[in-house]
Amino acid sequence: MYTKKFTSMEKSMEEDKRIVKPSSSLIVVIPTILVIIVLWLRNITILDYTHVLLGGTWTGIDLFMGLVISRVMIKMSVGARIEFIRRLVPMMLFFMPTIASLAITAGIYLATYEGIFSLRYPVIILAGIIVLVLVIQGFAIFLPNELRIYFELRKSQPDSKKISRLALINFRLSGVQAAFQFAIIFIMANIANGNLFLKF
């Protein structure tokens, strides 16, 4: 009986030590399936709602990471900081790139369905430039840093300073991305008002 309990505790501890669990795939699969269903329905209202929801989630998380988490992280002890980063890895490695990609995809389809996905509109050009900057930041800096953190955490003796440095870079980058997303929100507001040429 005690052996079974001990084995169960061992398994539980091993599960807890895992950085990425099988359930982590759900934060990629579920949003992706939902967006595919929304695109298949071709309902502009539902697609608009989905785009706003995804974009708002992306902006909110980036803002929280950049303004709050980065400041809290500096005041943490090294051990607490590394454990906190380890817990965040699944979200930062899988959820954030997924939400960002789906928000952009939903936005492109929405603009196409509304007949405004054209380079003759300044709002589309500006939105495209900002999205390009966000994509470059996300997939050329943010994601590679998260992968470095993940592989460093898997080592028998992780480099705490390296992990903290990379995590802080990403948290601060999240704040920068939030600023670009505010610009996107301004553009979206103009599109909603029919001001496609940004006339004031």
Label every model-predicted segment.
Residues 2-200:
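Polytopic transmembrane helical bundles with strong interfacial aromatic enrichment
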